[in-house]
């Protein structure tokens, strides 16, 4: 898989290595005329330049490489243990060309084909060689585009889920950077996205496949939106999104010029998109009754009839939850909107929660769903009116709460003042009582004490 930069360490001059590679090709082909003999007149001037340390003739090298690369198709028949080293030698030689890209794209096309000498391990060998090529190129080199295409093609043809899983993190983290660095045009970017989508689909990753189909759709210029190729891609993206169980946001599709062009070329399919974008199960069932799925765009959606109806139920419940002012949905209301038995309501609510469309709590005791959060499928004038209504309700509630808080605050202050006043009066009352007692004691005359003599006399008696 693509990784940090790699350097191939191969000893020898260009002429020596080219002659050695030609001998190897002759050994594999076992036919006449000899490639080595054909290259000898071209290699001799290069050999002399190398010996004299003169500047090599790049045009002469390119002529040699043209013959070597043309004959390299035979490498896919080489013994399994020799394939990697043989291709590495060829890649090393190609890096001496005036424009390596004109040769690397052809080498990549060879590696995208089956390696007949190793049916079992051929894809792994090809991916290993292509990864080496990719990593020997500078990060900004547009030649990497052809190499990545070949890697993705090998993975798709071999249906190697493990190989795709190894490549997937690189695609997620690096692909936008690569595309910007390579400066691809719309056609090249579209081709790469579709190749990745095909590989992801072969590996069973429907979500990533859908993502890259939509990205491929976004590369179509507005001027080309009505062309057959654009129409085919728009139909593919739309049918994939409608039938995919995890795709509920259709905004990227409705924003595409190619999808908008379906309003003319495939009006019933576009009408179905509008229903899934903003309408409910009632509208969907009425549409299907009047326009069977088998009659829409060649019947591409007919096999997904059950999946479409199930998705429409989830979307309907999301719309119902989003438009309920009280944030409480009785089971009976849900059952009626979804056309399901009352005993199945909780199952559908749970499925909608798992899809990330709503959040809330089921109350079996009260037979209702308490909505905490709901996803708006579209957000227009109606939704703004709903938001305004809810904000007004919250405002009135907050005003009531604020009134209660103010009343309680005033009561608290009043009671504190009264308590403080009472405490002060009580303190003043106690102080007055103490002063009166002291005054009373001062005003009372002191009792005379008996004379000592009298006391003594009494004691004597």
From Swiss-Prot:
Cellular compartments per GO CC: eukaryotic 43S preinitiation complex; eukaryotic 48S preinitiation complex; eukaryotic translation initiation factor 3 complex, eIF3m
Segments forming domain PCI: 205-376
Biased composition (Low complexity): 445-461
Entry keywords, A to Z: Cytoplasm, Initiation factor, Protein biosynthesis
InterPro entries: COPS7/eIF3m, eIF3m, eIF3m_C_helix, PCI_dom
Gene Ontology MF annotations: translation initiation factor activity
Known function: Component of the eukaryotic translation initiation factor 3 (eIF-3) complex, which is involved in protein synthesis of a specialized repertoire of mRNAs and, together with other initiation factors, stimulates binding of mRNA and methionyl-tRNAi to the 40S ribosome. The eIF-3 complex specifically targets and initiates translation of a subset of mRNAs involved in cell proliferation.
Family: Belongs to the eIF-3 subunit M family.
PANTHER family in the cross-refs: COP9 SIGNALOSOME COMPLEX SUBUNIT 7/DENDRITIC CELL PROTEIN GA17, EUKARYOTIC TRANSLATION INITIATION FACTOR 3 SUBUNIT M
Protein name: Eukaryotic translation initiation factor 3 subunit M
Organism, as annotated: Aspergillus terreus (strain NIH 2624 / FGSC A1156)
């Amino acid at each position: 898989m693509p990784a940090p930069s790699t350097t191939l360490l191969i000893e020898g001059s260009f002429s020596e290595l080219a002659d050695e590679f030609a001998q190897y090709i002759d050994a594999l082909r076992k036919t006449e005329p000899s490639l080595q003999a054909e290259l000898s007149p071209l290699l001799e001037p290069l050999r002399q330049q190398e010996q004299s340390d003169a500047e090599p003739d790049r045009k002469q090298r390119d002529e040699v490489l043209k013959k070597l690369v043309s004959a390299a198709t035979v490498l896919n028949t080489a013994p399994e243990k020799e394939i990697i080293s043989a291709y590495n030698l060829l890649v090393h030689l190609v890096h001496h060309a005036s424009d390596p890209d004109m040769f690397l794209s052809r080498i990549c096309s060879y590696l995208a084909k089956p390696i007949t000498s190793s049916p079992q391990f051929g894809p792994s060998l090809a991916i290993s060689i292509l990864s080496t090529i990719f990593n020997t190129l500078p990060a900004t080199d547009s030649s990497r585009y052809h190499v990545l295409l070949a890697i993705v093609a090998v993975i798709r043809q071999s249906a190697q889920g493990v190989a795709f899983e190894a490549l997937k993190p690189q695609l997620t983290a690096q692909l936008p950077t690569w595309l910007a660095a390579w400066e691809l045009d719309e056609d090249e970017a579209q081709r790469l996205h579709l190749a990745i989508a095909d590989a992801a689909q072969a590996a069973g990753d429907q979500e990533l496949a859908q993502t890259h189909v939509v990205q491929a759709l976004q590369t179509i210029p507005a001027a080309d939106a009505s062309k057959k190729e654009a129409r085919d891609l728009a139909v593919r993206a739309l049918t994939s999104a409608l039938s995919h169980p995890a795709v509920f946001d259709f905004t990227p599709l409705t924003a595409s010029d190619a999808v908008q062009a379906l309003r003319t070329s495939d009006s019933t399919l576009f009408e179905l998109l509008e229903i899934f974008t903003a309408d409910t199960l009632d509208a969907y069932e009425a549409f299907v009754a009047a326009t069977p799925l088998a009659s829409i765009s060649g019947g591409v959606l007919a096999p997904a009839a059950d999946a479409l109806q199930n998705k429409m139920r989830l979307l309907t419940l999301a719309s119902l939850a989003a438009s309920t002012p009280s944030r409480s949905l009785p089971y009976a209301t849900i059952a009626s909107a979804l056309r399901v038995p009352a005993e199945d309501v909780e199952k559908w609510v749970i499925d909608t929660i798992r899809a990330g469309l709503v959040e809330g709590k089921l109350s079996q005791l009260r037979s209702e769903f308490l909505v905490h959060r709901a996803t708006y499928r579209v957000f227009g004038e109606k939704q703004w009116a709903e938001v305004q209504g809810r904000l007004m309700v919250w405002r009135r509630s907050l005003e009531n709460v604020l009134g209660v808080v103010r009343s309680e605050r005033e009561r608290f202050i009043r009671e504190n003042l009264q308590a403080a006043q009472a405490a002060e009066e009580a303190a003043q009352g106690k102080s007055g009582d103490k002063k009166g007692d002291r005054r009373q004691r001062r005003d009372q005359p002191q009792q005379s004490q008996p004379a000592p003599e009298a006391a003594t006399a009494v004691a004597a008696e």
